[in-house]
Amino acid sequence: MKHLLKMSDLTPGEVTHILDVADQLKAQQKLGGTAPLLAGKTVAMLFSKASTRTRTSFEVGVYQMGGLGNYINTSELQAGRGEPLKDTARVLGRYYDCVVWRTYRQRDLEEFAALAGVPVINGLTDYAHPCQVLADLMTIRERRGTLAGRKLCFVGDGGSMANSLIVGGLLAGMQVTCVCPEAYRPAADVLMLAHKYGSAFHFTSDPVEGVRDADVVATAVWNTAAPGTAESEQRLRDFVGFQLTGKLLEAAKPDAMVLHCLPAHRGEEISTAVFEQHADEIFDEAENRLHVQKAVLAILLAGK
């Protein structure tokens, strides 16, 4: 593994290895602290978008492993005044051992990684959110023991979370169902890849059909438009019936897990009652962002 840009860059063995290392690092932290695996290492954390979990978990993780992490708002860089991305990549690659970037466009991240000369980690783009999906898989494995053969259902917008969870679940040997309105399907290349797994993948626009007998049901915010705007109102209409409610989850297994990458818009993609009923799972998932990201850093920078 040279970078972590999207889930399809990984092999099934690499996914398992990341989760195994994350388990080890989490156990060590609970016992008093992680070994200084990043001593003498520097990590740039570039953010072009607001963040709570990604920023803080990377900052804490780098600190816990003895490294130096620098948070950088990209609006403060010369790139915000017209310096070419390729120049920024080649400069930061001379200063830092690794770069984490949360940005808008996946193609910018890919270009940056091709030129930086150091490992680059995707902190969220319009196409992929691999760190979050690794945390999801870690949480499922912690609570259910195994991933292979379990039914994972994603309900929501076919954006970065859907793209990444589909691929991540399939790499882990899960049966994956994606439930989206037809106008909000995942990326075409993700669907093409997923269908190569045959009966292990299913796409539907029927939420009840999708969650039927699911072991795990995941969702994410699907209305990011400003409240009251035409786009927001259109999305509210388009996603009628796609909210995770107690009624919808009656079709899933009685002990089904519910995951949400946060932040949550209660009353839109998930009801308040369902969120609170599954809060322990959801906040374990949030905590595990820290541990899987530490694992990725340890693998990329310390040869774990």
Report residues per predicted region:
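Positively charged, low-complexity intrinsically disordered leader regions
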Residues: 1-56, 60
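Short, structured coil segments at secondary-structure junctions
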Residues: 65, 95, 115-117, 172, ...
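Active-site cofactor/substrate anionic-group-binding motifs, chiefly glycine-
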Residues: 42-43, 47-95
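Glycine-rich phosphate/diphosphate-binding loop of Rossmann-like nucleotide-binding domains
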Residues: 48-60, 142-220
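Anion-binding alpha/beta catalytic cores of soluble intermediary-metabolism enzymes, centered on
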Residues: 90, 97-168, 260
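Adenosine-phosphate binding glycine-rich loop
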Residues: 255-256, 261-304
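Rossmann-like adenosine-cofactor binding region
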Residues: 195-273
